[in-house]
Design a protein with these regions (language model features):
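Short, functional N-terminal and low-complexity linear motifs
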Residues: 1-4, 24-28
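Structural recognition of short helix-loop-helix hairpins that underlie histone-fold modules
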Residues: 12-22, 34, 38-45
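Short, functionally important structural connectors and interaction interfaces within domains
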Residues: 9, 37, 74-76
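Short, intrinsically disordered N-terminal pre-domain segments
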Residues: 1-15
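Short loop/turn elements at secondary-structure junctions
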Residues: 14, 20-22, 29, 47-96
Length: 96
């Protein structure tokens, strides 16, 4: 199962909110993001990987329709996801 090292505070910052009312939703969106990456062939996320954090930000902004620009964020997210799925550092199966 994929994991990403990101706090709820970081996710709030990604969508530029400071309240806690959306914390549960942000947590669910994070899990949906990881599932989407996994279904696209991403098998591992390196520790402290900035591309995966930037891609998560795009995903959250798409799903939350940030500034009414969901289409723009969806296209950017899909492009980043494809890049990750094609890169060897994300497709290697982690050893347990």
């Amino acid at each position: 199962m994929l994991t990403i090292n990101v706090t709820i505070e970081q996710m709030r910052s990604m969508v530029r909110i400071s309240h806690t009312k959306l914390d549960d939703e942000l947590g669910m969106l994070k899990e949906a993001y990881l599932t989407d990456l996994s279904m696209s062939g991403v098998n591992t996320i390196p520790t402290d990987d900035m591309l995966s954090l930037a891609t998560l930000m795009l995903y959250l902004r798409w799903r939350e329709n940030y500034n009414g620009e969901a289409d723009r964020y969806e296209k950017a997210y899909e492009a980043a996801k494809i890049s990750m799925s094609l890169a060897s550092e994300y497709s290697e199966v982690p050893t347990v």
